[in-house]
Amino acid sequence: MVTVTELRATAKNLGIRGYSTMRKAELEEAIRDHGRVSEARVASPRRSPARSPRKSPAGRKSPSKSPAGRKSPSKSPAGRKSPSKSPAGRKSPSKSPAGRKSPSKSPAGRKSPSKSPVRKSPSKSPVRKSPRKSPAAKLQAGDRPASMNICKNLPKQRLVDIATEMGIDLNRESDGKPKTKDQLCADIMGGAGRKSPRKSPSRSPVRKSPSRSPVRKSPVRSPRKSPVRVPSPVRSPVKEKTPVRSPARSEDAGSDLAPRPRRGKAVRLDYDEDDDYSYGASTDNLFSGNKEIPFPTRKRRTRKPEKVFVDVRSPHTLTDSEDEDDMVEVPELEDKEITMPGVLSPYSDEIVERGYVSQGGADYINYIYRTEYALESDESFARGARPKTNKRDSDRAVREAAAAAAIARALDRRSQSGNDEPAVRRRSAPTDSSRESRRDREPQRDIAEPQRDIAEPQRDIAEPQRDIAEPRKVRFREAGSADVRVFERDEPKEYGRVPVRPPLFMPAGEPLQPLKFRPKTPKIDDTIHRAQMVLPSKPSQKETDNYYKQFAGEAVRPSEPVQWDKDDQVLYHKVPAWDDSSYAAAVSAWPMSVDPKQAESVFAEFEQLSAQDSDLIKVRKSIMKALGY
């Protein structure tokens, strides 16, 4: 009784493809077929596909190096020949069944593919069974497939058979190369295409195609081999190098996103319906609602958001305070996947409902980076780090106030550090619970009397304590308020540790003043133009004011009513009240640097305006302006 190993050796010598994966019975059958077929083959190269021995179950045609899900239970390490590559003919004109008894011919030593003697044989039909049966594969041998799609799903060999039968040339006219499946399909479906009688096409070497992958996903992407071997002199088997499988293509050989074009083949991009490319009705409100951003974003792995300490005492700067315990340096934030448009904006004072996204200038970035502010227990105060200083902070007073506050805080933290309990837990909310008054008193107290702070250490620690109970939106403090907040970030913020950023877009050439008369942006506005999604709508009055104030180094107090700029205030309150009766007198009394013509025009304007009964403030203002006040 022949062992599998012997059968394998025989099969190898005969050059049967796929022998290393076959079971014993299959091997015997293949060897038996072998002689019969080869005679028939040599006799008529154009044999009808009906006779083609596609029965031989050649297993999966993958390099046998990867034991992917190999069928063969008995796989001997000897069978190292990778069947899909070897261009060895399945038939060679060797003794037919007699061949089975010749394991003697192949000494066990020479099992490496480079040595196998009869591997290339003059006639060759690359027989392969399609890895999975597609419904199309059940067609009868002769007839041509019903539709292009079915055609493309057929195994290559099947196409080759049909083409041969229809008398279609298997090699391209342009270069002698074998046609790709798509080309074959086109020809087959296009009717019994141009029967160009060519001289027997020269044997083209096997293609090294990068797409050969350990587990073939679909029959469509099978590596291209020249479909028909025409008898030609035996070449030395050593020429054939093992193709390098490029590491870049993993087993998703045809990833949909950007298939690397194979040589000479057009790339077909196909997107399946339900992946990110759905541009539905949602495009009209790009950033509204909590939906994901509708254009495909690259997915990144997301870690759990760390808690990050942030010093928000002075809103637009970082302080220079050198106190170790004071702040914790923010670790570098890795790229996180951007999921939701932002909800909280440090710029708006009102607590905003969950779904609301401010469209205004200052929040433009904040609604892309969404931030949740939450207070956290104080264990983390322990791991101090030297605070980064921000060079933009040029404001001495701010820095000093903050530093003094920080030092005081550090001192009392040190004075209490006897027990391990975190400092903040120690005490209930302070008696003086009115934030406003305390905030106004603070900077002076912190600078002037650090001693009192040591005497009564709980005083400014206890305020964040109140927030631990019910975390609410962070309100920014003026410089001295000793208030270190913690907030949890799930998205990267670009710079520094402070979630405040000047608005992306300030109206271009406009002077400061006209900002004042801009109508407020409505809270929620679903009717936005496309353009406004890119250029955010104009910032609200309050945002603008705060923005300029912050750069002037003033503190922005959340609660205070909107104030005019200083010079406006002068304009409004220091101007003597006008009455129409004294107007002419006033004009005549005015220094003569104003030429009478101009005064005249001013007067005319005044008449016209008051005739329209527009409100006096506007009139007054325009007059003052015209008179060069």
Curated annotation (Swiss-Prot):
Region (Disordered): 30-155, 169-327, 376-474
Bias-annotated ranges (Low complexity): 400-409
Comp. bias (Basic residues): 48-58, 117-132, 195-227
GO annotation terms (biological process): DNA-templated transcription termination
Pfam families in the record: Rho_N
Superkingdom: Viruses
Native source organism of the sequence: Frog virus 3 (isolate Goorha)
Composition bias, Basic and acidic residues: 30-39, 170-184, 237-252, 305-314, 390-399, 433-474
Record InterPro entries: Rho-like_N
Name by which UniProt lists this protein: Uncharacterized protein 032R
